[in-house]
């Protein structure tokens, strides 16, 4: 499991505890599987804090991997490169470049406008994205530690100027919310005018 940051809508420590005790024995046989967790220091601290209160957790079922911005790591055939996000400013929140040797995805969920050091890294590494998935939580409102449609357009144009995308690159918007007062169908019509695709539960994308 790869975590971007420690906000509770992304990191459910209670469910991790369930996975590390006999409650999960049906799907996870003792001494057979280890839960591999990747995250920053804040993610580790949150997990360890809740684990310390649960006497039934078996720590041998978990292996934590500390990840940091701009330091790639691999899980199976996938290469992950963490990038700095603009989100939860009291920790190093992350987004990811994910590559499988054929295609490259920018996973920019839960972030405001990308920091310059992140954009500089993308440009310096000459990364080209086949798919860009962007946070759009703010909708038609001004962005903050989340992006809205304006920031989505600006990021796409910046990536184009950097030659980090191609005419065939697909752009998906995720993490949208009700804060801008629009239902999904209304917002979908708006983003469609900008050439974006709005995600939904169960969406599968083939690259």
Residue ranges of predicted features:
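Active-site regions of enzymes building and remodeling cell-envelope glycoconjugates
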Residues: 61-64, 79-81, 191-198
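Cap/insert and terminal regions of metallo-dependent hydrolase folds
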Residues: 114-203
């Amino acid at each position: 499991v790869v975590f971007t940051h420690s906000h509770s809508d992304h990191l459910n420590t209670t469910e991790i505890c369930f996975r590390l005790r006999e409650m999960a024995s049906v799907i996870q046989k003792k001494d057979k599987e280890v839960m591999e967790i990747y995250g920053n220091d804040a993610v580790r601290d949150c997990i360890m804090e809740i684990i310390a209160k649960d006497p039934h957790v078996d720590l041998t079922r978990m292996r934590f991997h500390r990840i940091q911005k701009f330091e790639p790591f691999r899980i199976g055939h996938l290469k992950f490169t963490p990038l700095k996000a603009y989100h939860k400013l009291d920790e190093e929140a992350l987004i990811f470049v994910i590559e499988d040797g054929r295609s490259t995805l920018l996973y920019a969920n839960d972030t405001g406008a990308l920091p310059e050091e992140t954009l500089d890294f993308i440009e310096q590494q000459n990364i080209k994205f086949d798919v860009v998935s962007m946070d759009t939580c703010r909708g038609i409102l001004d962005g903050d530690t989340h992006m809205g449609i304006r920031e989505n357009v600006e990021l796409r144009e910046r990536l184009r100027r950097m030659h980090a995308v191609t005419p065939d690159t697909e752009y998906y918007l995720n993490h949208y919310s009700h804060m801008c007062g629009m239902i999904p169908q209304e917002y979908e019509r708006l983003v469609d005018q900008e050439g974006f695709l709005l995600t939904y539960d169960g969406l599968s994308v083939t690259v």
